[in-house]
């Protein structure tokens, strides 16, 4: 189990517990419950690159305490 930090453009930080082998799509579902919005409206970036739903967090080198940027579509 890892904890990922998600930051939106307004300075809000959200901590999300997940597994490294979760897909980005799975991660968005967990995050959407905390945000109260549809997973399809969430866009996540790491280092300026948009994360694709079918790829795992591990493949994007997302580990414990990694920071992701949150945007809304």
Swiss-Prot record:
Residues annotated as domain Ubiquitin-like: 1-73
InterPro entries: Hub1/Ubl5, Ubiquitin-like_dom, Ubiquitin-like_domsf
Tagged with keyword RNA-binding: no
Alphabetically ordered keywords of this record: Ubl conjugation pathway
Molecular-function GO terms, alphabetical: protein tag activity
GO cellular component terms given for this protein: cytoplasm; nucleus
Annotated GO biological process: cell morphogenesis involved in conjugation with cellular fusion; mRNA cis splicing, via spliceosome; positive regulation of RNA splicing; post-translational protein modification
Protein name according to UniProt: Ubiquitin-like modifier HUB1
Gene: HUB1
């Amino acid at each position: 189990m890892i904890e990922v930090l998600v930051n939106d453009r307004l300075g809000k930080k959200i901590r999300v517990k997940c597994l490294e082998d979760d897909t980005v799509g799975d991660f968005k579902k967990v995050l959407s419950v905390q945000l109260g919005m549809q997973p399809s409206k969430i866009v996540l970036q790491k280092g300026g690159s948009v994360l694709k739903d079918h790829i795992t967090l591990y493949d994007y080198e997302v580990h414990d305490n990694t920071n992701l940027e949150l945007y809304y579509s």
